[in-house]
Amino acid sequence: MKMLKFTIEQIVWQEVPGEVSLAFLFSGCPLRCKGCHSADAWKEGIGTELTEDYLRGRLKRYRGLISCVLFMGGEWQPETLQKMLGIVTQAGLKACLYTGLEREELEAVSDGILPYLTYLKTGRWQMELGGLDSPTTNQKFIDLRTGEVLNRLFIKDKPAPKIIPITTQPQAAAFQTA
C-alpha cells in the first residue's frame, strides 16, 4: 500500500460549512489545474507521511474540538485513503474529500471511498469560473447523506458598499467680536 504525504495540516472553519475540520493537504496531485492555489504540493513524495498512528493521535488530541476531517486530495492512493477514512468514521467524525475529479471520475478511480464520506467537493479549478464562492463555478460541494448540493452555503451576499456622505459645513465662530 502506497503512503499519503501531507504538506499542510490545519484546523479550518470555512471549507466544510457548519463543521470544524482537521484538514490535510496531500502532495502529488496529478491533475495540475491551471491557477491552482496548491501548486507547491504537486510534487509527489514531499511532506510528512500520514500514518494510521499519526492520524489516531491527531484525532485524540482534537477530540471534542473538531467534527470533521477534510482530506484535500489523496484519491490517487485509494487504498490508503480508504483506510484513513475508516479511522475517521470509527472515531465518530464526519469525513470530507476535496477532489478536482468529477464524481464519475472519482468512482472510476477509487470507488471504495464514497461510503466513508459525508461530504464531497468535486470539479477541477477553473479560474474563469471561480471556486465554491462563485455562482458560476463548475465545482460542487455535496452532502452525500442527502445528495444535496450545498454550494449556496459558500456564496456570501455581497451588499453594496455603504456610502456615508461627508459634507463640510463651516463651523460657527466660537467667538464673535463686536
Label each residue range with its predicted role.
Residues 43-57, 76-114:
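Canonical radical SAM enzyme core domain
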Residues 24, 33, 120:
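Conserved, mostly hydrophobic/aromatic
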Residues 1-25, 30, 38-44, 175-178:
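N-terminal [4Fe-4S]-dependent radical SAM core
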Residues 33-41, 63-66:
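Short, basic/glycine-rich phosphate-binding loops at helix/coil junctions
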Residues 117-178:
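Classical nucleotidyltransferase
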Residues 65-88, 137, 145:
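Conserved glycine-rich "GG(E/T)P / GGGxP" loop and the immediately following alpha-helix
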Residues 56-63, 107-129:
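Structural recognition of alpha->loop->beta junctions
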